[in-house]
């Protein structure tokens, strides 16, 4: 069985653990059943969730059994934020989001194939509404609440911060009871003895450990453990997982596969070594080789390309990744634009300077106007100079006539035009 702790330490993933020697021994004696919770606070997971989802997968590949727990019940409340009360979403919305998260999480782990005998390391995908939905108010207060100290709960950093500001509802104040009880139920039902989560979850996770000790006195499945992962920050000080257009989602309807690929491909050279260790399943030797290439030949972006391809394939599938790569090549003159998947081309053009216009192709203005309206050049006179100097392209064909207009035959898939200034500046026109 692979020493998963050594691997996680090398990758810089471990923030805190309970007694490391005890945890290492339990893992060596394994397989250990572990879990991570994912609350449906939105209709999709985003790239920030990948750290936990992929860490679960690393444990599975090391010979352990992961449980991905979707918070169908805890999502009705939401883990308290440091600055403000969460908006409560309707039960119908939560149910829809739970379904979305289950579908997304299923792509990271290996489950028992239908009709097959389960293996000890086959993953489980559970919903805490299964037990929390049956919990009564009296049961919560009598059987769970009596094990919690108000003094300790008030000392929690999030609670203190909120009480110093706008305050906190009892609903959010009691969230820790529910998350802690999740650990108890998974311990009882599945012999789960390890919970993982982000470093901000340390207090909630250790509260679950205490509750197991209090409710399961003799600990029939052995002692429970906790492990949190490090907070991921970017070298430029901005928040990981955010772009100018917002969060980078795993749902292709919210973030296109093309935009997802470009997010990783555009990673800062200072960040890519850490990203490789946290998000890639490549071996230590492969990662160190890519890190060296970044140092020696940064312009090649070999590490960024490798990670973008690996994660796009993992999240969106091999075919979508191929579509994205072909689109990236074709946009910059190294492929045939007409052969691209229309959805991929449309998504790609929305990630570059573009303009969306209504009407027919006959109603479109001259090309110099289109170049200016996309922002590829600052003005129509600049567009004319670019054409005269041989630096303007329509669908990768050089434009030589400053009076040129677009024809029906120029439209890709009946609605797209790809404009380019020089080798690297790409823009687009999308007909509605």
Curated annotation (Swiss-Prot):
Pfam families: SYY_C-terminal, tRNA-synt_1b. A motif ('HIGH' region) lies at residues 40-49. A motif ('KMSKS' region) lies at residues 239-243. It comes from the Bacteria. Its EC number is 6.1.1.1. It is found in: Cytoplasm. GO terms for molecular function: ATP binding; RNA binding; tyrosine-tRNA ligase activity. CDD domains: TyrRS_core. InterPro entries: aa-tRNA-synth_I_CS (IPR001412), aa-tRNA-synth_Ic (IPR002305), Rossmann-like_a/b/a_fold (IPR014729), S4_RNA-bd (IPR002942), S4_RNA-bd_sf (IPR036986), SYY-like_C (IPR054608), Tyr-tRNA-ligase (IPR002307), Tyr-tRNA-ligase_bac-type (IPR024088). GO terms for cellular component: cytosol. Keywords: Aminoacyl-tRNA synthetase, ATP-binding, Cytoplasm, Ligase, Nucleotide-binding, Protein biosynthesis, RNA-binding. GO terms for biological process: tyrosyl-tRNA aminoacylation. NCBIfam families: tyrS (TIGR00234). Catalyzes the attachment of tyrosine to tRNA(Tyr) in a two-step reaction: tyrosine is first activated by ATP to form Tyr-AMP and then transferred to the acceptor end of tRNA(Tyr). This is Tyrosine--tRNA ligase. It comes from Thermobifida fusca (strain YX). The lineage of its organism: Bacteria, Bacillati, Actinomycetota, Actinomycetes, Streptosporangiales. The gene is tyrS.
């Amino acid at each position: 069985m692979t020493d998963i702790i050594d691997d996680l330490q090398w990758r810089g993933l471990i923030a805190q653990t309970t007694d490391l020697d005890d945890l290492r021994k339990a893992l060596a004696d394994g397989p250990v059943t572990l879990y991570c919770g994912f609350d449906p606070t939105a209709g999709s997971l985003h790239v920030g969730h990948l750290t936990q989802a992929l860490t679960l997968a690393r444990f599975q590949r090391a010979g352990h059994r992961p449980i991905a727990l979707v918070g169908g019940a805890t999502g009705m409340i939401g883990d308290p934020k440091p600055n403000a009360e969460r908006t409560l979403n309707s039960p119908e919305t939560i149910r829809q989001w739970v379904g979305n998260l289950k579908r997304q999480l299923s792509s990271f782990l290996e489950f028992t194939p239908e009709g097959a005998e389960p293996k000890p390391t086959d993953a489980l995908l559970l919903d805490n509404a299964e037990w929390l939905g049956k919990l009564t108010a009296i049961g919560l207060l009598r059987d769970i609440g009596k094990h919690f100290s108000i003094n300790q709960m008030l000392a929690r950093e999030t609670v203190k911060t909120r009480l110093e500001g706008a305050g906190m509802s009892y609903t959010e104040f009691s969230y820790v009871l529910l998350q802690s009880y999740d650990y108890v139920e998974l311990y009882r039902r599945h012999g789960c003895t390890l919970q993982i989560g982000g470093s901000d979850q340390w207090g909630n996770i250790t509260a679950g450990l205490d509750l197991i000790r209090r409710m399961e006195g003799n600990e029939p499945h052995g002692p429970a453990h906790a492990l949190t992962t490090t907070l991921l920050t970017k070298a430029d000080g901005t928040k990981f997982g955010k772009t100018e257009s917002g969060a980078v989602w795993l749902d292709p309807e919210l973030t296109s596969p093309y935009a997802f690929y470009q997010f990783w491909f555009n990673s800062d050279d200072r960040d890519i070594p850490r990203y490789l260790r946290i998000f890639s399943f490549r071996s230590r030797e492969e990662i160190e080789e890519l890190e060296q290439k970044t140092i020696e030949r940064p312009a090649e972006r070999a590490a960024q390309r490798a990670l973008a391809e690996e994660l796009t394939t993992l999240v969106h599938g091999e075919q979508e990744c191929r579509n994205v790569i072909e689109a990236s090549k074709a946009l910059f003159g190294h492929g045939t634009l007409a052969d691209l998947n229309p959805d991929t081309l449309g998504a790609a053009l929305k990630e570059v300077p573009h303009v969306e216009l209504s009407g027919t192709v006959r109603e479109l203005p001259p090309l110099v106007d289109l170049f200016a309206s996309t922002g590829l050049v600052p003005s129509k006179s600049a567009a004319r100079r670019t054409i005269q100097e041989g630096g303007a392209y329509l669908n990768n064909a050089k434009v030589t006539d400053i009076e040129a207009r677009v024809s029906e035959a120029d439209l890709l898939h009946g609605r797209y035009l790809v404009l380019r200034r020089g080798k690297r500046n790409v823009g687009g026109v999308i007909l509605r």
